[in-house]
Design a protein with these regions (language model features):
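Alpha-helical scaffold/interaction cores of sigma-54-like transcription cofactors
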Residues: 1-551
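Residue-level detector of conserved catalytic or cofactor/ligand-binding positions
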Residues: 552-563, 567-570
């Protein structure tokens, strides 16, 4: 069996474009005899941690990458009809330095360069190229575009620029599809490779798992673009070649240039990124100068708080409980965590921003009660501290804190001022195609009347985590339609194939992350409607040990009393 590694692969996080589910990619790679596989989503790194974990769980080496967009001029140029064009480029992380640089580039694409797409430019590529492997990408790459338009001198110039920057880590990318343009470009890339001494690498730009998934992928593109399968001008791939092909298929396609296959293994061997899980990276909290340690300051706040909260009713039980909790907090390294949360709650209260009494297991801490993080006495209500924090707990604890919805942003702004705006970010979340939604989406793409698909969608029970397959088991009427009506059978089969894929990204309603170094040192950033958020969801940030425990919820329950109080004073 020939050795080959897929280095240009789009997962479900190339939203409404990639149809490869992350959990399936390493499984399929292993089935086909491959021991490594890459993820290179369009302009984002949403799925890299899930991908990394899935690969590791299946004994497959994960290669972390991204297909970035490159501005034709600079990332700051945003002139209509000129700068809405962009080139594609594949970047793969060789090591953890490369991952950090890739994260920085992807972040800057959103923060500085967003114009239709998140774009980088050659200036920042030069600045953050260390630890990265670069491939010339698909037909949308700058080299390929110039070759396609017979601008050979420019193609050479572009290729040499990248070669000078990346050295032996720059490759010209040939792809295994039957598009007429690709066949032409492949031939010219081979010639360019021999002329300039730049290595070739074979890829397949895999957007779906198997050949038979191509139709579902076409439907997915219709959902993305709002088109119907009957529209002649719809966006589509002209062949069904864009799947995770076997090493044999790839080797057969490139039998005349076997070095392009061999170089995939060369690249895979160069790539070794590792993530650490289960540790905590807390930002530094500055304590007053008169305190030698952060723990001394927390203990002083706690001692003072106990005197205020319990006054003459301080008992040995209370003091012992506080001493025990403080020892656990210190031992587990969460002193700064308590101080950070105390600080922004204290700020909110000082500004007259209504704060909730506290929710969840954090209410079981007498230290939290004493210093004012919560307003619930754990002694009075027999609440257990160990539910919140104990040496056996692996995951990071968190306080659920509710603020007046109308003034929540003031608290976030304060945190940004205190720790630095580049050390604070909101957190991304994803909406997925639920059972009912995907039926309506697929029905629209197939040009089935809305009334019919809506009726079908309403047959799905209104239950949490319901799937179409479960609904078919529960609803006999739906099952009969599925079995007896070819049109509905087709619709539901496609819907099952697409169900659960992420549909859109948005900002988490109440989470923010605070980091020791700038956020994009650890995770890539995303921008939507002017709001900066992480590209990783909250649970992923927790796994990476980042302080995303600032559950700054803005709830209306806290808000109306303040509004009523204001009105009653008029």
């Amino acid at each position: 069996m020939p050795n080959f590694v897929h280095l240009h692969v789009h997962s479900e996080f190339s939203l409404l474009d990639g149809a490869n589910r992350i959990k399936d990619l390493p499984v399929r790679a292993k089935e086909l005899g491959m021991d490594s596989i890459a993820i290179t989503d369009h302009g984002v790194m949403f799925g890299v941690i899930d991908f990394y974990k899935a690969c590791k769980a299946n004994g497959v080496k994960p290669i972390i990458g991204c297909e970035v967009y490159v501005a034709p001029r600079t990332r700051f140029d945003k002139e209509p009809n000129i700068d809405n064009k962009y080139y594609h480029l594949i970047l793969l992380a060789k090591n953890n330095e490369g991952y950090k640089n890739l994260s920085k580039l992807v972040s800057l694409g959103f923060v500085d360069g967003y114009y239709y797409k998140p774009r980088i430019d050659k200036e920042i590529l030069e600045k953050y190229h260390e630890g990265l492997i670069c491939c010339s990408a698909c037909l949308g790459g700058e080299v390929a575009q110039n070759l396609l338009h017979d601008n050979l001198e420019k193609a050479e110039e572009v290729a040499l620029w990248h070669k000078n920057l990346f050295g032996d880590d720059y490759y010209l990318e040939v792809q295994a599809n039957t598009l007429r343009e690709q066949i032409i470009v492949n031939q010219k890339l081979v010639q360019l490779s021999r002329k300039l001494g730049i290595k070739l690498v074979a890829t397949n730009d895999a957007h779906y798992l198997k050949k038979e998934d191509s139709y579902n992928h076409e439907v997915l593109l219709c959902i993305q673009t709002g088109k119907r399968m009957t529209d002649e001008d719809r966006m589509k791939f002209e062949t069904d070649d864009f799947y995770v092909k076997s090493p044999e298929e790839m080797s057969e396609y490139f039998k005349n240039i076997p070095e392009a296959i061999e170089n995939t293994v060369e690249i895979a061997n160069k790539c070794n990124v590792d993530f650490e899980f289960g540790h905590t990276i807390l930002p530094n909290y500055d304590v007053p100068e008169e305190f030698e340690t952060h723990f001394d300051y927390l203990k002083k706040l706690c001692d003072d708080g106990i005197k205020i909260k319990y006054a003459e009713n301080v008992t040995k039980e209370i003091l012992d409980r506080a001493e025990y909790e403080l020892s656990v907090i210190k031992k587990m390294g969460y002193v700064d965590y308590f101080l950070i949360v105390w600080d922004y709650i204290n700020y909110a209260k000082s500004q007259g921003i209504p704060v909730g009494p506290g929710r969840g297991s954090g209410a079981g801490s007498i230290v939290a009660y004493a210093i004012g993080i919560t307003d619930i006495d754990p002694i009075k209500y027999s609440l257990i501290f160990e539910r919140f924090l104990n040496p056996e707990r692996i995951s990071m604890p968190d306080f659920d804190v509710d603020f007046c919805y109308e003034r929540r942003q003031e608290v976030i702004d304060y945190v940004g001022r205190k720790y630095g705006q580049d050390h604070v970010s909101q957190i991304i979340t994803f909406g997925t195609m639920s059972a009912r939604m995907v039926i309506r989406d697929v029905g629209r793409a197939l040009d089935i009347p809305y009334a019919e698909t809506d009726k079908l969608a309403k047959m799905i029970p209104n239950e949490l985590h319901i799937t179409i397959k479960k609904a078919l088991e529960q609803n006999r009427e739906l099952s009969k339609l599925y079995e007896n009506d070819p049109e509905i059978n087709k619709l539901l089969e496609i819907a099952i194939g697409l169900e659960g894929l992420p549909r859109q990204a948005s900002t988490h309603a109440c989470g923010i992350v605070i980091t020791k170094e700038p956020v994009d040192t650890y995770v890539p950033l995303y921008v939507r409607d002017g709001l900066i958020s992480t590209q990783f969801i909250m649970t992923t940030l927790e796994e990476l040990g980042l302080l995303n425990a600032l559950q700054i919820s803005g709830i209306h329950i806290v808000t109306p009393p303040r509004t009523l109080t204001s009105r009653s004073s008029l």
